[in-house]
């Protein structure tokens, strides 16, 4: 199996470094990741500026100032030969739950893989203490997948509790929960006494109802959320069509 491995924490993050080292024991892994932290870059693609890359002696590639999506795009369309069987994004040090899927570069990289016709995994650890546990879980998952491939192409957003393995209860297939955002903007001053603004802080107020990714993680289950790359709201096409027909006739 050929794996394209990327992330949004940057190529030097222990999440991608430890995972790539483990996976290279039994898979053909091409690492191509941003040169620095690109968290929160979502599905940003660089189209107005050229991208520079560096290839390390072990074959890993970094894209200077590139986004996770740039990395996956370049990897699939240029650098990776043969083409990947799977795109893996992570391991992110910090969960990507609920509304995070709209902002996360980890999820964005997996989305880009699916846009380009490949099954993709976005993998995040709910913290940074038990990274070795997360690496072992992903290793076993991909080893099983090697002999039991999916029948369809999927995007799976996988979040792993930051706990010792013995306390993780299993897997839950989940839906995205919701964060009750506090629309907080923090105004400050820079060294030149000019206004600067911070978005945050993050809220701790979540919808943790049964069946959500938040509920699974809170109860020490691995959360697996299938995502869609097609954002069309098919259920509302007829009602919206009727509204616009009335608008056009008015």
UniProtKB/Swiss-Prot annotation:
Main location: cytoplasm
UniProt: a divalent metal cation binding residues: 8-9, 39, 92
Coiled coil ranges: none
Reaction(s) catalysed (UniProt annotation): a ribonucleoside 5'-phosphate + H2O = a ribonucleoside + phosphate; a ribonucleoside 3'-phosphate + H2O = a ribonucleoside + phosphate; [phosphate](n) + H2O = [phosphate](n-1) + phosphate + H(+)
A single cellular component GO annotation: cytoplasm
Cofactor: a divalent metal cation
Root EC class: hydrolase
InterPro entries: SurE (IPR030048), SurE-like_Pase/nucleotidase (IPR002828), SurE-like_sf (IPR036523)
Transmembrane spans: none
Function: Nucleotidase with a broad substrate specificity as it can dephosphorylate various ribo- and deoxyribonucleoside 5'-monophosphates and ribonucleoside 3'-monophosphates with highest affinity to 3'-AMP. Also hydrolyzes polyphosphate (exopolyphosphatase activity) with the preference for short-chain-length substrates (P20-25). Might be involved in the regulation of dNTP and NTP pools, and in the turnover of 3'-mononucleotides produced by numerous intracellular RNases (T1, T2, and F) during the degradation of various RNAs.
HAMAP family to which the protein is assigned, alphabetical: SurE
Protein name as catalogued: 5'/3'-nucleotidase SurE
Organism for this UniProt entry: Wigglesworthia glossinidia brevipalpis
Gene transcribed to yield this protein: surE
């Amino acid at each position: 199996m050929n794996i394209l491995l990327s992330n949004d924490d940057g190529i030097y993050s222990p999440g991608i470094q430890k995972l790539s080292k483990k996976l290279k024991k039994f898979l053909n892994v091409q690492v191509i990741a941003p040169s620095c932290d690109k968290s929160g870059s979502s599905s940003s693609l660089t189209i107005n500026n050229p991208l520079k890359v560096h290839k390390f002696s072990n074959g890993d590639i970094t894209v200077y100032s590139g986004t996770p999506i740039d990395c996956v795009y370049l990897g699939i369309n240029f650098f990776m030969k043969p083409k990947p069987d799977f795109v893996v994004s992570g391991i992110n040090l910090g969960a990507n739950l609920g509304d995070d899927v709209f902002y996360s570069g980890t999820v964005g990289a997996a989305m880009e893989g699916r846009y380009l016709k490949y099954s993709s995994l976005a993998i995040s650890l709910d913290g940074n203490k038990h990274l070795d546990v997360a690496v072992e879980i992903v290793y076993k998952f991909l080893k099983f997948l090697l002999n039991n491939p999916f029948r369809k192409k999927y995007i799976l957003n996988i979040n792993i509790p930051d706990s010792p393995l013995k306390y993780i209860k299993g897997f839950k297939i989940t839906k995205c929960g919701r964060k009750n955002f506090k629309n907080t903007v923090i105004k400050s001053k820079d060294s030149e006494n000019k206004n600067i603004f911070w978005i945050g802080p993050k809220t701790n107020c979540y919808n943790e109802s049964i069946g959500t990714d938040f509920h699974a993680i809170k109860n020490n289950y691995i959360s697996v959320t299938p995502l869609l790359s097609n954002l069309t709201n098919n259920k509302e096409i007829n009602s919206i069509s009727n509204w616009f027909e009335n608008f056009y006739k008015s």
